[in-house]
């Protein structure tokens, strides 16, 4: 059984996919994005439902860090933490600068590119906030989810197993970004 919820969040909708085989008692959950901060209560209710049913979030994916994709997740997680309704989160997929550097430094033949050689001020523009992404990742690390964060998913195309289902994150390749 598969259930897909498209959760309206103005211009930053998010998705909640629930999946289980007939013989399974609990649903597997995949969450994509989190909507705007104004939708934090809806995101919290989803987390509460998952937690009360004794389920986990098998994979949470942030497609990119615009405020209309991360702020509902961040504020919803904060509310759920206060009420002790954060379910176990098995894996969180997002792209971060730290993940980018780790990936490229690990490639054969690549010259080390220390982060110190690149100085980019942390700035916010309307609708885009690197500071908000930093706050979210800090929260996730403080909550003990650091080892569950996959911080570089560009051209990953790795299989993500959710129960007996296989999912793929599809993204442009490094070449397409150059």
Predicted segments with their positions:
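Divalent metal-coordination and catalytic microenvironments
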Residues: 8, 33, 64, 92, ...
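Active-site environment of divalent metal-dependent phosphoester hydrolases
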Residues: 11, 38, 65-71, 99-101, ...
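Histidine (H) residue identity feature
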Residues: 10, 21, 28, 49, ...
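Amphipathic repeat-derived elements
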Residues: 18-20, 31-36, 42-43, 64-65, ...
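Conserved beta-strand hairpin/beta-sheet module of binuclear metal-dependent hydrolase folds
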Residues: 1-56
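Active-site metal-binding motif and surrounding structural segment of the metallo-beta-lactamase
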Residues: 25-28, 41-93
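A short acidic (Asp/Glu
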Residues: 16-17, 69-75, 103-106
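Flexible, acidic/histidine-containing loops and adjacent segments that form or flank the divalent-metal
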Residues: 1-2, 76-178
């Amino acid at each position: 059984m598969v259930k897909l919820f498209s959760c309206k969040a103005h211009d930053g909708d998010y998705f909640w996919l629930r999946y289980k085989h007939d013989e399974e008692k609990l649903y597997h959950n995949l969450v994509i994005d989190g909507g705007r901060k104004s939708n934090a209560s809806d995101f919290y209710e989803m987390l509460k439902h998952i937690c009360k049913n004794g389920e986990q979030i098998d994979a949470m994916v942030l497609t990119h860090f615009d405020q209309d994709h991360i702020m509902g997740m961040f504020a919803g997680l904060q509310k759920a933490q206060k009420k002790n309704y954060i379910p176990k989160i098995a894996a969180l997929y997002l792209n971060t600068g730290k993940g980018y550097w780790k990936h490229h430094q690990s490639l054969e033949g690549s010259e080390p590119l220390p982060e110190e050689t690149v100085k980019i001020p942390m700035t916010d523009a309307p609708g885009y906030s690197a500071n908000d992404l930093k706050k979210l990742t800090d929260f996730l690390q403080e909550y003990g989810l650091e080892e569950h964060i996959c911080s570089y998913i560009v051209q990953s195309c790795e299989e993500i197993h959710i129960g007996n289902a296989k999912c793929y994150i599809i993204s442009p390749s490094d070449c397409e970004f150059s």
